[in-house]
Amino acid sequence: EHYKYMQRAMWCMDAAIGEAARFSKAAIVSTDEFIKGPDCKTGIDAALNADDTINIMIIVDSKSDATTLLKWLQNVSYEHQMQLKHSDEFLDVKNQDGFYGIYAVFEVKSKDSKYGSLKIQVRISTPVLDCIAALEKCCESEEAKQLLEVYKKMA
């Protein structure tokens, strides 16, 4: 039962963040460790915290896109019974790099804590070049290192 729950949680987050990527010009990093601070200049930064909350930093290129994305995230969290916290917080980073950001925290609680925290992995989406910086931030992950090497060869 825990395995099914974990699979569902992973699928939900994968689908949610994958869809979110369509609103931005960036891609997604896959991680199973906390990334310090959602400070990616462009892209999506996702991290699973020790308390089974998931931090997602999404950068989009207009405030209207940010509003649309925010509504969509609220619907997704409701449908999949995930708690979306701090979802109304807009991070205006337009002065720095011309993008607007949303900081959202999803809470996915494990029903049986003896199995440890859930690991949420997110697929990398295109365009590739926009996510290289994000991948480099997460290079401690062996999977990220391998993907980065593949994409560098393709570029």
Say what each PLM segment does:
Residues 41-155:
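Long beta-strand-rich cores associated with HINT superfamily self-processing modules
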Residues 1-50:
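Charge-rich, low-complexity segments
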